[in-house]
């Protein structure tokens, strides 16, 4: 993820 608090 780019705008999330995730890795992808």
From Swiss-Prot:
It comes from Tityus obscurus (Amazonian scorpion). One of its GO terms (cellular component) is extracellular region. It is found in: Secreted. Keywords: Secreted, Toxin. GO terms for molecular function: toxin activity. This is Toxin To31. Coiled coil: none annotated. Expressed by the venom gland.
């Amino acid at each position: 993820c780019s705008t999330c608090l995730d890795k992808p």
